[in-house]
A protein has these predicted regions:
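Terminal targeting signals and extreme-terminal segments of soluble enzymes
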Residues: 1-128
């Protein structure tokens, strides 16, 4: 039995679905099943390649706070989704990654259609 890393599986799924009509939406829904907390927010992955992801979150009642703007944790969560997917997609198939921390700064209220974009380079992984 061979092991397929989550990043490899997601890249393969993206390659199969993204060219199809509605494929990005289907990929995003399947990703939401794999990551249920994030899936409840309903983000859509717009672009996915190793080290680069763009995800969209559309403002609606279920992601708003009492100030009638997108909740801060919804913003952080879609940012984490984009970052995690970019990192997972760039990692070698023999490696698994775990987020150990992140920091976010909020500069103003978020409203409307929001885009989270992550670009990263993964250093070479060695056994030592």
């Amino acid at each position: 039995m061979s092991y397929e890393s989550p990043g490899t599986r997601l890249r393969r799924l993206w390659a199969q679905l993204s060219p199809l009509p509605g494929g990005k939406w289907i990929f995003s829904k399947l990703l939401g099943l794999m990551v249920p907390y994030t899936g409840r927010l309903g983000p859509t992955v717009l672009h996915f390649e190793p080290g680069h992801v763009r995800a969209q979150l559309t403002e609606r009642r279920s992601v708003r706070n009492h100030l009638r703007s997108v909740h801060a944790m919804a913003l952080a969560n879609v940012g984490e989704l984009a970052t995690g997917l970019a990192v997972l997609g760039a990692m070698p198939s023999t490696v698994r990654g775990i987020l150990t921390g992140y920091s976010i700064t909020y500069t103003k209220k978020a409203r409307g259609v929001l885009i989270a974009e992550s670009k990263c380079a993964i250093p070479e992984v060695t056994d030592s």
